[in-house]
Amino acid sequence: MNSASFLQSRLISRSFLVRRSLKRYSGLAKPYTFQQPTIYALSTPANQTSAIAIIRISGTHAKYIYNRLVDSSTVPPIRKAILRNIYSPSSCSVKPHDQKESKILLDTSLLLYFQAPYSFTGEDVLELHVHGGKAVVNSILKAIGSLHDRSSGKDIRFALPGDFSRRAFQNGKFDLTQLEGIKDLIDSETESQRRSALSSFNGDNKILFENWRETIIENMAQLTAIIDFADDNSQEIQNTDEIFHNVEKNIICLRDQIVTFMQKVEKSTILQNGIKLVLLGAPNVGKSSLVNSLTNDDISIVSDIPGTTRDSIDAMINVNGYKVIICDTAGIREKSSDKIEMLGIDRAKKKSVQSDLCLFIVDPTDLSKLLPEDILAHLSSKTFGNKRIIIVVNKSDLVSDDEMTKVLNKLQTRLGSKYPILSVSCKTKEGIESLISTLTSNFESLSQSSADASPVIVSKRVSEILKNDVLYGLEEFFKSKDFHNDIVLATENLRYASDGIAKITGQAIGIEEILDSVFSKFCIGK
């Protein structure tokens, strides 16, 4: 083993010890969390009546709970669905089959038992698939809780938010990025969010982050070899300038990769929060009708009276897998005697400034009012900026083909080819599909995603660590152009970046506060 390889192995030992502490029981009957209390909770939504509810139990006493609930001394079959009666433990003898006539039946349930370490948490896990009535669920949860008896070593408690996922992490079943992917998968509302969450859950981000960390450690090893073995006259470390050059080149390449990744994250965040789509136009051009057509619902009040919509109306819709926050706004006109309407107009302009994409709705039935000057002035203002705009000619069913041609010509003459122009009819639905297709293309461009490529979405925690720890450490490494004069400081900056990645995946030492923050955002039962 050469000096650099030796140093690399020494540098990763800290990470190795952490991983070993997490996974040392992964192949044995006893998981790392063996001595922790057995936990239980409802894994399906609470306070909702449903056909089925799933109660999850995880820990050393899962088999004991099974025996007491079904009044049996047999070992539950592993990974096999069985149908059993569930009884109140207080009505059963500790010795099974005694006093059968006094047993209180709670429900008939489908049971699944997973033996450690081959379960989600890495512990013994028992799942009760019971009927979904609130009374049924509450009675069984109460029955499980009644089995807690610390004096006899039966430490059984109700799970806290994220407890099951925390056990899975502690037993080396998943890293933090995968578990955050599970949470995002549960919370996903659209196809693009689902694809991104599934990518994290499958470990794509984990592999990427681990490769980054390995690159940093390899280059730290090169620098540390110079520090520790400079007096050994080793042939491998004599050409220090070449080593410095290679390390600098490698770290520049890595930094560029992370910056590109962060840019994709920033673009993809729009998918998580929802793309803000605002409809602008003069009064009575059909903005509300278009909102109702796109949402397939009567979100906005439709009337022939100008100024009907006086305030902004937001609605969440799913457009071809994209989460969209669509906003209907008050019609914009220069003068109005109605103070409330003027407030609505002001709010409409502010909403458009905050939007990701604007639909400028025009009415083709009156060429003289086709392009109101006040709206054009707003769209070309510095405040509005260079936002994307699509011109939508509504009410196409009210004009002839020749009249529509005149309208399109006037729009192109005044606006040029800067904005795409589409015609639709909310009455006949003509052009709506074409509009949706154009919107989808813009959404793909805004988020740098497509039907074939998953967007890159990470938690705020991961994003902040990448920025404040990883990139910060790398930038500090470059601050001194002549960094080889202080190799120790340069190496420590790389270590700072490496430790940042370890925080992301959960391999860092002393990360209890990080774990508390991550799992507190999970639901109970997960």
Curated annotation (Swiss-Prot):
It comes from the Eukaryota. SUPFAM superfamilies: P-loop containing nucleoside triphosphate hydrolases (SSF52540). The keyword Glycoprotein does not apply. It is found in: Mitochondrion. Keywords: GTP-binding, Mitochondrion, Nucleotide-binding, Transit peptide, tRNA processing. Residues 1-19 form a transit peptide. InterPro entries: G_TrmE, GTP-bd, GTP-bd_TrmE_N, GTPase_MnmE, MnmE_dom2, MnmE_helical, P-loop_NTPase, Small_GTP-bd. It holds the Pfam family TrmE_N. GTP binds at residues 281-288, 328-332, 394-397. GO terms for molecular function: GTP binding; GTPase activity. NCBIfam families: mnmE_trmE_thdF, PRK05291.1-3, small_GTP. PANTHER family: TRNA MODIFICATION GTPASE GTPBP3, TRNA MODIFICATION GTPASE GTPBP3, MITOCHONDRIAL. HAMAP family: GTPase_MnmE. Belongs to the TRAFAC class TrmE-Era-EngA-EngB-Septin-like GTPase superfamily. TrmE GTPase family. Present with 768 molecules/cell in log phase SD medium. GTPase involved in the 5-carboxymethylaminomethyl modification (mnm(5)s(2)U34) of the wobble uridine base in mitochondrial tRNAs. Involved in the expression of cytochrome c oxidase subunit 1 (COX1). Works in association with the small subunit of mitoribosomes. This is tRNA modification GTPase MSS1, mitochondrial. It comes from Saccharomyces cerevisiae (strain ATCC 204508 / S288c). The gene is MSS1.
